[in-house]
């Protein structure tokens, strides 16, 4: 019977074993520190107490919304579709704490979850109805080609695989919008400014625009109204606001 050859187990150098052990100990320490930091962060947050005035204000807001929306149902005098305008730009300029659920859902459908954000919307009867629902919290109007171009060039960002990327590469635009005939930034600007049958897909490719508002204006109501103006429809005067906040 042939003798079986003994297989030699390769020896690991002692210095390499020490390095591995030190590395594993370091990773364990880092994981423990991260866990402790997370617990401390949770402790630091604590409970958030809401003042009685806030509850009263939210209740008043909900009642006001209910009355306003009921009036819209009884007398749905929607704005007439303009002949020469097919594009609107909507900016959210008010907080929505305590508003009705319908207003919250409509704000979400318009992708205006953050205050001082804006989106392009195609002028249709359905969209005009949505704008009437959220009218006390947004301002909107009809942007011209210059405003569309300036917004997209300065603040345009795209949504690609749940990531936000700047519109600096035409290959990205062609890759995602080429099937709609949009292969460069100029094509995208044209398709937004003059809405066509693929406006929905192209506009949703863009992230909502985050406008620049002075900090003092957000804290000072008088300064805020002076800089932003009041909510509601403002027609072509939206172009002045875009240039002011872009």
UniProtKB/Swiss-Prot annotation:
Q: What's one GO MF term for it?
A: RNA binding
Q: Which domain of life is it from?
A: Eukaryota
Any one biological process term the GO annotation gives = maturation of LSU-rRNA from tricistronic rRNA transcript (SSU-rRNA, 5.8S rRNA, LSU-rRNA)
The cross-references to PROSITE patterns, in alphabetical order and at most eight, read:
RIBOSOMAL_L30 (PS00634)
Q: Does the keyword Phosphoprotein apply?
A: yes
List the SUPFAM superfamilies.
Answer: Ribosomal protein L30p/L7e
Q: Which residues carry this modification: Phosphoserine?
A: 54
This protein's UniProt keywords: Phosphoprotein, Ribonucleoprotein, Ribosomal protein
Keyword Ribonucleoprotein in the entry? The reply is yes
Q: Which GO terms describe its cellular component?
A: cytosolic large ribosomal subunit
Q: Which family does it belong to?
A: Belongs to the universal ribosomal protein uL30 family.
Record-linked PANTHER family = 60S RIBOSOMAL PROTEIN L7, RIBOSOMAL PROTEIN UL30-LIKE
Protein's name in the database: Large ribosomal subunit protein uL30-like 1
Which organism was this protein described from?
Pongo abelii
